[in-house]
Swiss-Prot record:
Residues 1-51 are annotated as: Disordered. The keyword Coiled coil does not apply. The keyword Acetylation applies. This is ATP-binding cassette sub-family F member 2. GO terms for cellular component: membrane; plasma membrane. GO terms for molecular function: ATP binding; ATP hydrolysis activity. The modification Phosphoserine is found at residue 512. The modification N6-acetyllysine is found at residue 304. The modification Phosphothreonine is found at residue 218.
Length: 623
């Protein structure tokens, strides 16, 4: 029988459950009370929107099913079925008949955080999908959560979307409310409450709110409808769900895409505490360094394992490859020497012939035991921005500029005053919504100032790379056809092939329809197109999304060799460190120059997280 204290506790929780079930006359929406008649008026429109969302969701699911059908995976579980470690041998993976992995091993150990790296198009995302859909033999007791796409737009709030993902907790709470409403036996109710306590049910909303806050959602945003957010923000909600559920195996594919630097720093600190199995694909060396305990290199149809973060991987791999090449050259020298000796003395005197036979046996043993292979290096890229010529300063002058999107809307910038020229190398940083992309649009003329003036040199050409540039590509054309169409002055196809080849698109990729290319390859088409605009100023808004690490390094080298000016918006700390000479912070309707480098700014963001934590805990207690 339960104690008196337990009975009182159960009675209290029962009353709270009943209170939650009482109908309300209205609910809060963006700070305003919305009554039931107002809700009813929206039903017809919402019904239409829901139908469209359902159709889009079904299309995405069908697409994923087609991809899965074109994928073939084989492998054998080598670890104990009850183990929390996963060891799979003889792993092979093919997609549309193309072999991505061949007779390799997958080793994922509990408590380790793995960074999965490799060139664009090599099959990293395909491998994550195969693991997430259990196409490899992973024991059932290991639950897997694979973050695949953004949340579809709906009337749900981000907070609700995050909390509903914990299905066991939601089911237990629903059952507890039902029993409380029916005035059921106290013992059964107590069992449910005990299980909910184990799942931190009382703290679930606080934890969900903390995660959303870390990813940039203010308290008001957490209660807005999902359909009012852009795709990037809905992707953050999907990421928050993945973090909230705490699966035993968490699979993240480019989790920092669509995040600002503040959210990247928070996510890095959050993932550092993940104690189960984490596998993430990321193009950010800085992020991989901060999070990962191990690196998996997908290369030459094999998975190769390295202990340590990304920097340690680079060091270890270089040492191993140097030793491998030394061994390779030594073996080749030995083989050449023995073959030469056998050819010269194999038919000589008896003594020399015996020595030749001995060397032939040694050679056969070497060949039978397996020779060291030559190191196959990743293909190196060499991006190129053509010379733009000189124009005298000032190239762009910003004079007392203020901007707001609507007459009654909030002011994004107030009285900006600065100039930029061909020597400018600036990274714009600051939280989402502070106006970084807005500033680039103002400077290009895509947006006009509400007040003030922006003066540009009459001959200046500006090239702006942004996240939606891919949408402007003609997907039915090949990269070669698209570039020939955009730049008809280049008559020879071979010349254009060389141009495109510098951006990592070679052979069949140049003549395949753009729709068949990976996101990273489409980005390269956009970069090639941008470069041959021959701009004086490069405005780069998140250029690293979908690019691999080697491509980002090639882009950084090209920017550093570029004769013109550059303004960059990026969540990649390492790229900023490589190319930016100044850091400008966009915040509170103005722009201020940061006194240090980007690494000092990152430490500043970390210290802000520490300062905000007590305030956040206090605020979420009052939710």
């Amino acid at each position: 029988m339960p104690s008196d204290l337990a009975k009182k506790k159960a009675a209290k929780k029962k009353e709270a459950a009943k209170a939650r079930q009482r109908p309300r006359k209205g609910h809060e929406e963006n700070g305003d009370v919305v009554t039931e008649p107002q809700v009813a008026e929206k039903n017809e429109a919402n019904g239409r929107e829901t139908t469209e969302v359902d159709l889009l969701t079904k299309e995405l699911e069908d697409f994923e099913m087609k991809k899965a059908a074109a994928r073939a995976v084989t492998g054998v579980l080598a670890s104990h079925p009850n183990s929390t470690d996963v060891h799979i041998i003889n792993l092979s993976l093919t997609f549309h008949g193309q072999e991505l992995l061949s007779d390799t091993k997958l080793e994922l150990n509990s408590g380790r955080r793995y960074g999965l790296i490799g060139l664009n198009g090599i099959g990293k995302s395909m491998l994550l999908s195969a693991i997430g859909k259990r196409e490899v033999p992973i024991p059932e007791h290991i639950d897997i959560y694979h973050l695949t796409r953004e949340m579809p737009p709906s009337d749900k709030t981000p907070l609700h979307c995050v909390m509903e993902v914990d299905t066991e907790r939601a089911m237990l709470e629903k059952e507890a409310e039902r029993l409380a409403h029916e005035d059921a036996e106290c013992e059964k109710l107590m069992e449910l409450y005990e299980r909910l306590e184990e799942l931190d049910a009382d703290k679930a909303e606080m934890r969900a709110s903390r995660i959303l806050h870390g990813l940039g959602f203010t308290p008001a945003m957490q209660r807005k409808k999902l359909k009012d957010f852009s795709g990037g923000w809905r992707m953050r909600v999907a990421l928050a769900r993945a973090l909230f559920i705490r699966p035993f195996m968490l699979l993240l594919d480019e989790p920092t895409n669509h995040l600002d630097l503040d959210a990247c720093v928070w996510l890095e600190e959050e993932l550092k505490t993940f104690k189960r199995i984490l596998v993430l694909v990321s193009h950010s060396q800085d992020f991989l360094n901060g999070v990962c305990t191990n690196i998996i290199h997908m290369h030459n149809k094999k998975l190769k394992y390295y202990t340590g973060n990304y920097d340690q991987y680079v060091k270890t791999r270089l040492e191993l490859e140097e030793n491998q090449m030394k061994r390779f050259h030594w073996e080749q020298d030995q083989i050449a020497h023995m073959k030469n000796y056998i050819a010269r003395f194999g038919h000589g005197s008896a003594k020399l012939a015996r020595q030749a036979q001995s060397k032939e046996k040694t050679l056969q043993k070497m060949m039978a035991s397996g020779l060291t292979e030559r190191v196959v290096s990743d293909k190196t890229l060499s991006f190129y921005f053509p010379p733009c010529g000189k124009i005298p300063p000032p190239v762009i002058m910003v004079q007392n500029v203020s901007f707001k999107y609507t007459k009654d809307g909030p002011c994004i910038y107030n009285n900006l005053e600065f100039g930029i020229d061909l020597d400018t190398r600036v990274a714009l940083v600051g939280p989402n919504g502070a106006g970084k992309s807005t500033l680039l649009k103002l400077l290009t003329g895509e947006l006009l100032p509400t007040d003030g003036m922006i003066r540009k040199h009459s001959h200046v050409k500006i090239g702006r790379y942004h996240q939606h540039l891919q949408e402007q590509l003609d997907l039915d054309l090949s990269p070669l056809e698209y570039m020939m169409k955009c730049y008809p002055e280049i008559k020879e196809k071979e010349e254009m092939r060389k141009i495109i080849g510098r951006y990592g698109l070679t052979g069949k990729q140049q003549v395949s329809p753009i729709r068949n290319l990976s996101d990273g390859q489409k980005c390269r088409v956009c970069l090639a197109w941008l470069a041959w605009q021959n701009p004086h100023m490069l405005f780069l808004d998140e250029p690293t999304n979908h690019l691999d690490i080697e491509t980002i390094d090639a882009l950084a080298d090209a920017i550093n060799e570029f004769e013109g000016g550059m303004m960059l918006v990026s969540h990649d700390f390492r790229l900023i460190q490589q190319v930016a000479q100044e850091i400008w912070v966009c915040e509170k309707q103005t722009i201020t120059k940061w006194p240090g480098d980007i690494l000092a700014y990152k430490e500043h963001l970390k210290s802000k997280l520490v300062d905000e934590e007590p305030q956040l805990t206090k605020r979420t207690h009052n939710v």
